[in-house]
Amino acid sequence: MTNIRKTHPLFKILNDSFIDLPTPSNISSWWNFGSLLGVCLVVQILTGLFLAMHYTSDTTTAFSSVTHICRDVNYGWLIRYLHANGASMFFICLFIHVGRGIYYGSFTSVETWNVGIILLFTVMATAFMGYVLPWGQMSFWGATVITNLLSAIPYIGTTLVEWIWGGFSVDKATLTRFFAFHFILPFIIAAMVMVHLLFLHEKGSNNPTGLNSNADKIPFHPYYTIKDILGIFILILTLISLVLFAPDLLGDPDNYTPANPLNTPPHIKPEWYFLFAYAILRSVPNKLGGVLALILSILILSILPHLYTSKLRSLMFRPLTQFCYWLLVADILILTWIGGQPVEYPFITIGQLASTLYFSIIVILMPISAIIEDEMLKMN
């Protein structure tokens, strides 16, 4: 008798995706982050659901409702901090996942890569709207500053901003709609993850060498399920440690002050995971130029498959491009640091240099180094 997991219409899909999936035998721990992102998404949806049961999306009570969750709800403080720090873990895994994709040439699977970029944009939008919900000072002013950027769009900018706000400033209507979108988007993300996996399993996983691995594949279960479970334990341990020992480490103290439209914080900045993009935005003196640079800082990932000039897929055997890659990583860390600094000399200049270098590495240095390597290895 054939096993039910191979015949049942529903189990068959799960079996082909997580059990009998042919997987390259040499994929490293850098391939763990896909499953870790899945765990992060589940944690965020569950904790978010419990928070939504007690949260009120009204400007007069939003801040108090978050205080109420932390003080009066059973383990409310734990749920709240799991959700807030879970977002940070989500972005750490996300950045490593994208970084691994760039390093090992996974972007040559164009459909999977493009769905991934859309997912990245959607997750960033969700996180931004979630940051507005506690209605602290940084929530309010962050929402005001970031939504105001849309006013840089010619002709329709101001109308568009007022339409998003639901009035002439960030107010009750804005908070209510942000809560509605913040609630629904994770489920849309979950659906898009299915599409991402669908495209991935169409061609199969890449591997560290970047070579065709059809001759050497092993079933996903038990080999990679065990490997993923280890990663999940490490992730949960890190998250729990962060929540229990330093819950406010990655937050902003200004967000413990209720939102006040009459008092601007001395330094408005988003959460740490947006700082690199925020630094790129600030480094362009022109408003519209800054907005375009901000969007391009993520959208530039979509042109990677078209800038791909090497005969070798992975950077494993390409030391020159490896150098450019790690230069890019260092540059993103510098941008993250600059995004959290005040707008004054020398931070402005460092930000402008780092932003220019960011785009230059991706568009100019990496493709050129690939051509040089091909020439040196006589690959042409």
Curated annotation (Swiss-Prot):
Cofactor notes: Binds 2 heme b groups non-covalently.
Organism domain of life: Eukaryota
Keywords tagged on the record: Electron transport, Heme, Iron, Membrane, Metal-binding, Mitochondrion, Mitochondrion inner membrane, Respiratory chain, Transmembrane, Transmembrane helix, Transport, Ubiquinone
Residues reported to bind heme b b562: 83, 182
Database matches in InterPro entries: Cyt_b/b6_C, Cyt_b/b6_C_sf, Cyt_b/b6_N, Cytb/b6-like_sf, Cytochrome_b, Cytochrome_b_C_euk/bac, Cytochrome_b_N_euk/bac, Di-haem_cyt_TM
Gene Ontology terms: biological process: mitochondrial electron transport, ubiquinol to cytochrome c
Subcellular compartments: Mitochondrion inner membrane
GO molecular function: metal ion binding; ubiquinol-cytochrome-c reductase activity
Topology relative to the membrane: Multi-pass membrane protein
Assembly, per entry: The cytochrome bc1 complex contains 11 subunits: 3 respiratory subunits (MT-CYB, CYC1 and UQCRFS1), 2 core proteins (UQCRC1 and UQCRC2) and 6 low-molecular weight proteins (UQCRH/QCR6, UQCRB/QCR7, UQCRQ/QCR8, UQCR10/QCR9, UQCR11/QCR10 and a cleavage product of UQCRFS1). This cytochrome bc1 complex then forms a dimer.
Family (UniProt): Belongs to the cytochrome b family.
Further remarks about this protein from its record: Heme 1 (or BL or b562) is low-potential and absorbs at about 562 nm, and heme 2 (or BH or b566) is high-potential and absorbs at about 566 nm.
Function description: Component of the ubiquinol-cytochrome c reductase complex (complex III or cytochrome b-c1 complex) that is part of the mitochondrial respiratory chain. The b-c1 complex mediates electron transfer from ubiquinol to cytochrome c. Contributes to the generation of a proton gradient across the mitochondrial membrane that is then used for ATP synthesis.
Name the UniProt record assigns to this protein: Cytochrome b
Source organism (scientific name): Steatomys parvus (Tiny fat mouse)
Gene: MT-CYB
